[in-house]
From Swiss-Prot:
Family according to the record: Belongs to the RnpA family.
Keyword entries, A-Z: Endonuclease, Hydrolase, Nuclease, RNA-binding, tRNA processing
Function (record text): RNaseP catalyzes the removal of the 5'-leader sequence from pre-tRNA to produce the mature 5'-terminus. It can also cleave other RNA substrates such as 4.5S RNA. The protein component plays an auxiliary but essential role in vivo by binding to the 5'-leader sequence and broadening the substrate specificity of the ribozyme.
Organism name: Aeromonas salmonicida (strain A449)
Reaction equation(s) it catalyzes: Endonucleolytic cleavage of RNA, removing 5'-extranucleotides from tRNA precursor
Assembly: Consists of a catalytic RNA component (M1 or rnpB) and a protein subunit.
SUPFAM superfamilies: Ribosomal protein S5 domain 2-like
GO biological process, one term: tRNA 5'-leader removal
Gene giving rise to this polypeptide: rnpA
An annotated Gene Ontology molecular function: 3'-tRNA processing endoribonuclease activity
Keyword RNA-binding belongs to the record: yes
EC number of this enzyme: 3.1.26.5
Annotated protein name in UniProt: Ribonuclease P protein component
GO cellular component: ribonuclease P complex
Bilayer-spanning residue ranges: none
């Protein structure tokens, strides 16, 4: 497993097949601004994929900010997550949130997802 608190290539969902697997039978944790989908993986660590559509967040600056905050939150919380593949889907309401609010919301969603995936 990679050292704690990194976000290396092996911690990312990279191919369309990885994303399709998560979308096929997901465990959900959602808020009006963000949805997290997850499914178990055969690895010993969680992996993250991001879906931040232009339709929800028109400006690249907004999309990049959301991705940056999600990656940082995942990086700091990955040790407490089970071996699951996670796809984060941003919705339009996320652009009104500041970084601190988004970070707190993500921590709550990580805990919810962890509980649902562990039984």
């Amino acid at each position: 497993m990679p050292t704690p608190h990194t976000f290396s290539r092996e911690l990312r969902l990279l191919t369309p097949e990885h994303f399709k697997r998560v979308f096929a039978e997901p465990v959900r944790a959602a808020s009006p601004q963000i949805t997290l989908l997850a499914c178990p993986n055969t690895l010993e660590h969680p992996r993250l994929g991001l879906a931040v559509p232009k339709k929800a967040l028109k400006r690249a600056v907004w999309r990049n900010r959301v991705k940056r905050v999600v990656r940082e939150s995942f990086r700091l919380n990955q040790a407490s997550l089970p071996a699951i593949d996670i796809v984060v889907i941003a919705k339009g309401g996320v652009k009104e949130m500041d970084n601190e609010e988004l970070f707190k919301l993500l921590e709550k969603l990580w805990r919810t997802l962890s509980r649902r995936c562990n039984g």
